[in-house]
Regions:
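Phosphate/nucleotide-binding beta-alpha loop and adjacent structural elements of enzyme active sites
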Residues: 1-157
């Protein structure tokens, strides 16, 4: 395997913001399965926690926080299975462009929540691979991670 040639002296640290385990297999899953990477999965939608733990057979640390700018926001809760819960109100016209997505983006509840900045998360340290899937809030998340921004080796939005 090509990873054997890398001769890593420590595990790769993967952080996934918006880690809801829905339809697709994350690109880093095999690294976690092979115990080459440690995964920190961050998803503020507490309904997602058990499916994240199940997907990784407990080889994951889950942080149930919404990451943004550290301020209060409206949270637009959509069906758990859709993974579309967001700090941004879904635009039904835009979602209709994608076949069936207007159903996924249907808001079932709105509530006020407090967010945290990426920089305020303790015990994460440097990040080798950052994946962010936050329904349009990706730039806001990265912008509020100034202390960590230059510690990313790879990031994927």
């Amino acid at each position: 395997m090509i990873l054997d040639d890398l001769k890593l002296n420590q595990k790769i640290k993967v952080v996934d913001i918006g880690a809801a385990a829905i339809a697709e297999t994350p690109v880093y899953k095999s690294l976690v399965d092979l115990e080459i990477a440690d995964l920190i999965a961050i998803d503020g939608d507490i309904r997602q926690k058990q499916s994240i733990l199940s997907l990784y057979n407990e080889k994951v640390s889950v942080i149930s926080e919404f990451i943004s700018d550290g301020k209060e926001h409206n949270l637009y809760l959509c069906a758990k299975e859709s993974g579309m819960t967001s700090l941004l109100k879904p635009d039904i016209n835009a979602l209709t462009f994608f076949n069936g997505f207007q159903i996924f983006g249907e808001v079932i509840k709105t509530e006020k929540i407090n967010t945290k900045k990426l920089d305020s998360l303790e015990n994460i340290g440097s990040i080798d691979f950052l994946k962010v899937d936050a329904q349009g809030s990706e730039l806001n998340i990265i912008s509020n991670g100034e202390k960590r921004r230059f510690l990313f080796n790879v990031f994927l939005c």
